[in-house]
């Protein structure tokens, strides 16, 4: 008879635990409404991102863009999506494709064809049948902008100019260029069934960003394009050649990193260049920036845009310590809280440890963080399971996105678990 109260208590405990399961099940209608966390977004910080005044004005270029090379974010644009001829700025794509090819074929040589010899000035002055090391020709291509070297490089890498153009267009698509069409490796005005040889300022900046920030051969690209001069010979050492860098921007501003000029009758003067200072890297792309006798317009526009970036944009830390609220998991198991049928479970931000946690922001510009996280869930849930998303915006532009996941596994409460818990913890 003395044990009877304990049995009663045990039965009541078991009933309470099972009742808890029932209440957890009644949470399901709420859980269903909230399961799609994408539909339950909450703006946790809301700040004005409006920018006022001080933007570059009176640019000579018909199309221009300034981007942050780290993120690819556009900081300033003028008709940056208008398709225009690009002249010899084309050669940055020719160069990076050749450098990536050389990684697997470091001693590649090129025999000069009639097509290469026939290219108009500016040219190296090759002779049919001569042979050169492919890497030597890249200095001729980038320092002197030799058109014959561009054709020789294309033929050495792909066998023909046409096949090399296919590689150029494939690489452009890979980079994310949407309005670029390559026909020639040197940028001379051309037209085919796909259209004219052309790009946009925005696409051209993307290509330069790939060359200096993303490609496996970015360091070699900088080595070639920054060289003051370079000497080489044909493979039989019969003739010697000397190249000098004509990119005046490299001596124009502290931190000037790389660049390529261009000019044709259709394109006008063009330029794409980059600058790195105080851990900030900017890229400027200009198309149709004057015609003769206005050769200096591109340098004025480049300086104006670079100075705008340097003066107004600084890095700001993305808040790594942002507090994410716990979620409630119905019908879960916690041995330390057996009577609690709705558990509070912590959530973490899945941010790669090596990722740059800073973003380039204009003075007066603010970050906006959007938290998408459902408050109620049903067990079971596994550790690391995705339960939401944290997204950062600058105005309407998404600049970072991180999944949210739970920190621990939550097992489902069952009748059998309740019975086992009572047997284990209650003395009958």
What are these regions, as identified by a protein language model?
Residues 2, 27-216:
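Active-site-adjacent loops and short helices of periplasmic peptidoglycan-processing enzymes
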Residues 3, 8, 35-36, 321:
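N-terminal cationic leader/targeting segments used for protein routing and processing
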Residues 6-26:
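Sec-dependent N-terminal signal peptides of Gram-positive bacterial secreted proteins and lipoproteins
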Residues 195-428:
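Domain-terminus/edge residues, biased toward the C-terminal soluble/receptor-binding domains
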């Amino acid at each position: 008879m003395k044990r009877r109260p304990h049995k009663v208590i045990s039965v009541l405990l078991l009933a309470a635990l099972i009742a808890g399961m029932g209440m957890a099940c009644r949470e399901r209608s709420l859980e269903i409404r909230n399961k799609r966390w994408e539909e339950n977004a909450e703006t946790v910080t809301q700040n004005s991102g409006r920018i006022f005044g001080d933007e570059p004005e009176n640019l000579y270029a018909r199309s221009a863009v300034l981007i942050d090379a780290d993120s690819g974010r556009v900081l300033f644009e003028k008709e940056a999506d208008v398709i225009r001829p690009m002249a010899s700025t084309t050669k940055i794509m020719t160069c990076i494709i050749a450098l990536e090819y050389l990684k697997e074929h470091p001693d590649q040589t090129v025999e000069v064809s009639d097509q290469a010899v026939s290219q108009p000035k500016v040219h190296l002055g090759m002779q049919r049948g001569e042979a050169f090391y492919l890497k030597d020709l890249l200095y001729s291509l980038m320092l002197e902008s030799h058109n014959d070297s561009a054709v020789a490089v294309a033929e050495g890498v792909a066998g023909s100019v046409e096949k090399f153009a296919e590689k150029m267009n494939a690489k452009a698509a890979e980079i994310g260029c949407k309005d670029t069409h390559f026909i020639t490796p040197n940028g001379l005005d051309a037209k085919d069934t796909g259209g004219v040889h052309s790009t946009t300022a925005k696409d051209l900046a993307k290509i330069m960003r790939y060359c200096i920030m993303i490609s496996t051969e970015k360091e070699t690209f900088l080595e070639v394009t920054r060289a003051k001069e370079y000497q080489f010979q044909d493979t039989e050492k019969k003739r010697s050649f000397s190249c000098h860098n004509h990119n005046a921007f490299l001596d124009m501003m502290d931190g000037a990193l790389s660049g390529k000029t261009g000019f044709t009758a259709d394109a006008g003067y063009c330029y794409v260049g980059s600058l790195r200072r105080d851990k900030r890297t900017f890229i400027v792309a200009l198309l149709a920036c004057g015609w003769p006798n206005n050769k200096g317009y591109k340098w004025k526009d480049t300086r104006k845009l670079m100075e705008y970036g340097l003066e107004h944009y600084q890095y700001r830390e993305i808040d790594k310590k942002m507090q994410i609220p716990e979620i409630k998991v119905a019908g879960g198991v916690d041995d330390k809280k057996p009577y609690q049928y709705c558990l509070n479970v912590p959530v973490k931000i899945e941010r790669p440890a090596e990722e740059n946690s800073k973003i380039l922001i204009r003075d007066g510009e603010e970050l906006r963080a959007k938290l998408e996280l459902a408050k109620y869930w049903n067990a079971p849930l596994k550790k690391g399971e995705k339960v939401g998303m944290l997204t950062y915006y600058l105005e309407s532009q998404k600049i970072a996105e991180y999944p949210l996941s739970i920190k621990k596994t939550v097992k489902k409460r069952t009748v059998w678990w309740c019975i086992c818990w009572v047997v284990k913890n209650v003395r009958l």
